[in-house]
Curated annotation (Swiss-Prot):
Involved in the third step of the chorismate pathway, which leads to the biosynthesis of aromatic amino acids. Catalyzes the cis-dehydration of 3-dehydroquinate (DHQ) and introduces the first double bond of the aromatic ring to yield 3-dehydroshikimate. It is an enzyme of class 4 (lyase). 3-dehydroquinate binds at E47, W48, R49, R83, R214, S233, Q237. Homodimer or homotetramer. NCBIfam families: aroD. Its EC number is 4.2.1.10. GO terms for molecular function: 3-dehydroquinate dehydratase activity. InterPro entries: 3-dehydroquinate_DH_AS, Aldolase_TIM, DHquinase_I, Type-I_3-dehydroquinase. Pfam families: DHquinase_I (PF01487). Pathway: Metabolic intermediate biosynthesis; chorismate biosynthesis; chorismate from D-erythrose 4-phosphate and phosphoenolpyruvate: step 3/7. The keyword Lyase applies. This is 3-dehydroquinate dehydratase. It comes from the Bacteria.
Amino acid sequence: MKRKVQVKNITIGEGRPKICVPIIGKNKKDIIKEAKELKDACLDIIEWRVDFFENVENIKEVKEVLYELRSYIHDIPLLFTFRSVVEGGEKLISRDYYTTLNKEISNTGLVDLIDVELFMGDEVIDEVVNFAHKKEVKVIISNHDFNKTPKKEEIVSRLCRMQELGADLPKIAVMPQNEKDVLVLLEATNEMFKIYADRPIITMSMSGMGVISRLCGEIFGSALTFGAAKSVSAPGQISFKELNSVLNLLHKSIN
């Protein structure tokens, strides 16, 4: 039986896929403005994409913004993510700082989840995951391929590896070159969900071509999807309001 992931009042892996909406402001003013706009919205999780923040290399300033951000969103679960340039992010930082940043933020008690990239390496992952779990912070271990869609077996292998490394939520996002690539991602998702996963997983095929994968998680086995507030943080994201309507429609039809 698959275990569910409880984050505040949200149960990931139960019912329809949960909606996560990123905050991508470059400065404190913009970040707080986005937070105010989202605090009463129909969403499940807010992601702070801290790699967009102009002063991300100053941990003190990151914490100050985080404290204010939390005060506005109240009890909405918060995911903290620094996305590396290699995987589609905005800034380049050292692995040492990446590790320190995630540990320092996990220690604040202000975030509910953090995202750690699979290809940061086992040493970084072990250190961050173990620390976060001691602080009762859930961990997404993720991989983003902006160039291609790997073979089905490779997608499943990466998700299994994330699970082995202690991810509460394994996540993979891939780029389709054609319609068949979208089917490969969906087939890999379903195989992982039905055969190998003992916890919720998150998958998506990016770009407009892959948008169907962001909508049909309840059918194929992806437990969380990302929607945009105004600006997108990844190719293929659609408005979280439209996403909410479609997910509700599918959930009603399925059940």
